[in-house]
Amino acid sequence: MSTALPLCSILILAGGRGQRMGGRDKGLVSWHGEPLVAHVQHVVREFSDDVVISCNRNQERYALYADQLVSDAEVDFPGPLAGVITGLKVARHEWVVMLACDAPLIDQALIEGLLRLAVEHDSAAMVRQGGYWQPMFSVLPRRVLPMLEHAWAAGERSLQKALLGAVPVQALECAENDQRLSNFNSPELLL
């Protein structure tokens, strides 16, 4: 018998500079007639009444897909760890599903798998694809916030290092060629 999934917040990270997209805001780049962030939001919406998008520009456009918007406290696109810290501060639920805005092929089974793994072990859960951690596909308990803030204050800027150093992390193993984990972070990948 499977247990019910807990209420969770969804944190979609869309605050990057978009360098590999020629400076374009990746989450708003169109794919199959909709912005990439819309594809992610459609998949996750049924899991939560609290979709938070971390974005540092184009807030009015992102507002269409979020219940809350946050921006990094630091200027000049400091990286995903800054967005995670800011997002965890406003998340309304104890569990937070964290995803990249440029991963439109995710599905509900992936989200459910991460959530179940995190809840069963009462710890963070992260995709490990072909032996490599993928921090942009994670579930975090909000209680990791002080540990991530401490890592940031100590100079850590790597999301993966901060997460793996802060708390036990359960691995959701995925195949190296799992298309659900594709990041569309360059124009060529959108074709």
Swiss-Prot record:
Cofactor(s) required for function per UniProt: Mg(2+)
Keyword annotations of the record: Cytoplasm, GTP-binding, Magnesium, Metal-binding, Molybdenum cofactor biosynthesis, Nucleotide-binding, Transferase
Binding site for GTP: 13-15, 26, 72, 102
EC number(s) stated in the UniProt entry for this protein: 2.7.7.77
Database matches in InterPro entries: MobA-like_NTP_Trfase, Molybde_CF_guanTrfase, Nucleotide-diphossugar_trans
SUPFAM superfamilies on file: Nucleotide-diphospho-sugar transferases
Sequence intervals crossing the membrane: none
GO biological process: bis(molybdopterin guanine dinucleotide)molybdenum biosynthetic process
One GO CC term on file: cytoplasm
Keyword flag GTP-binding: yes
Subcellular location, record wording: Cytoplasm
GO molecular function, one term: GTP binding
Family classification: Belongs to the MobA family.
Functional description taken from the UniProt entry: Transfers a GMP moiety from GTP to Mo-molybdopterin (Mo-MPT) cofactor (Moco or molybdenum cofactor) to form Mo-molybdopterin guanine dinucleotide (Mo-MGD) cofactor.
Complex formation: Monomer.
Protein name: Molybdenum cofactor guanylyltransferase
